[in-house]
Amino acid sequence: MTYIEILGQNAKKASQSVARLSTASKNEILRDLARNIVADTETILTENARDVAKAKDNGISEIMVDRLRLNKDRIQAIANGIYQVADLADPIGQVVSGYTNLDGLKILKKRVPLGVIAMIFESRPNVSVDAFSLAFKTGNAIILRGGKDAIFSNTALVNCMRQTLQDTGHNPDIVQLVEDTSHVVAEELMQATDYVDVLIPRGGAKLIQTVKEKSKIPVIETGVGNVHIYIDEFADLDMAAKIVINAKTQRPSVCNAAEGLVVHQAIAKGFLSQLEKMLKESNQSVEFRADEEALQLLENAVAASESDYATEFLDYIMSVKVVDSFEQAISWINKYSSHHSEAIITNNISRAEIFQDMVDAAAVYVNASTRFTDGFVFGLGAEIGISTQKLHARGPMGLEALTSTKYYINGTGQVRE
């Protein structure tokens, strides 16, 4: 058997036992894990330091290194996320619908685990813990394949998960880490249809596209955030500038950070001037990649290429497009959007409603930063990712997104005539 086949076989077996765990047992194990991760802080930080040092040696940008870096506060935040998942209602066994039909059959539709989840993700080691917590709470086994940049951190965290399961008398193969980070093994995982029920990629555009093209397993697409903010002619310009600065600069390396700015021509001159002024006042610097009209209105800008409008920069860079109309803004955003999060800043209620209806994205904001697209903020607890597709799940994916449904039919000897 190949390496992936062994992991898959182990996961399939483990999925049968975890599916039968009671809510109380799952919650107790999750709380044990949270305590154990905090207790293992020094070990985890030591291993994370190896990843960070390697990343710096490889010339990875400081913004991307920050995604990788752990500290005591971030480890405590990881533990807090596990506690929050433990406190959430368990969807497994929930009756979605139920009725007795004309034949006297009692038909229930219940929530059940998906089975075995595989996840391929990049950089941030906290993702491994979030993914396990949600998968475990919903009675699933999970195979984690992180990037080579975080292999030492992920190994330390998964070892803690497996030890917690073993110490509580449960199969440690409920969670497994693919320790071989080669592309060959990753592609083998994408073909493991005999063992894996769903594959969730979480990372950059290249990773997502590779998984979509090569996976034979059903895929839930997540992550890529070419996010826009449209400043309407009826916007409060001061509020608009504050929102843009927050959405672009608070944490530019995450998928809900804004990447594109679309501005109505009627207020472009005043707004762009005010935006640059407020950026200077807040000691922030953003490189604007602008169209011809915006280029004449901005001090710190370069001419945009066509590819810039479709790029998730994950940096202090932002494309800028000036539009002649509200309708053109919607058309522009729908052309370049990755269907993650989009926003309009306006005091025109009618336009706000039309924008939310017509823009094709999982989350559409009016007068708020796109940085709020997050499982915790939406009340889901930790998220396994933000789905940008329409089937099965869309937007931040919490517990319910990791379940399926099953019909339970009970009779008293009925036969079909």
Curated annotation (Swiss-Prot):
One Pfam match: Aldedh
InterPro entries linked to this entry: Ald_DH/histidinol_DH (IPR016161), Ald_DH_C (IPR016163), Ald_DH_N (IPR016162), Aldehyde_DH_dom (IPR015590), G-glutamylP_reductase_CS (IPR020593), Glu-5-SA_DH (IPR012134), GPR_dom (IPR000965)
Predominant subcellular localization, coarse grouping: cytoplasm
Intracellular or extracellular location(s): Cytoplasm
Reactions performed catalytically: L-glutamate 5-semialdehyde + phosphate + NADP(+) = L-glutamyl 5-phosphate + NADPH + H(+)
Alphabetized NCBIfam families for the sequence: PRK00197.1, proA
Gene field: proA
Pathway where this protein functions: Amino-acid biosynthesis; L-proline biosynthesis; L-glutamate 5-semialdehyde from L-glutamate: step 2/2
Species per Swiss-Prot/TrEMBL record: Streptococcus agalactiae serotype III (strain NEM316)
Function recorded in the entry: Catalyzes the NADPH-dependent reduction of L-glutamate 5-phosphate into L-glutamate 5-semialdehyde and phosphate. The product spontaneously undergoes cyclization to form 1-pyrroline-5-carboxylate.
The enzyme's E.C. designation: 1.2.1.41
Protein name: Gamma-glutamyl phosphate reductase
Family: Belongs to the gamma-glutamyl phosphate reductase family.
Keywords from the named record: Amino-acid biosynthesis, Cytoplasm, NADP, Oxidoreductase, Proline biosynthesis
Gene Ontology terms for molecular function: glutamate-5-semialdehyde dehydrogenase activity; NADP binding
Biological process, per Gene Ontology: L-proline biosynthetic process
Annotated GO CC locations: cytoplasm
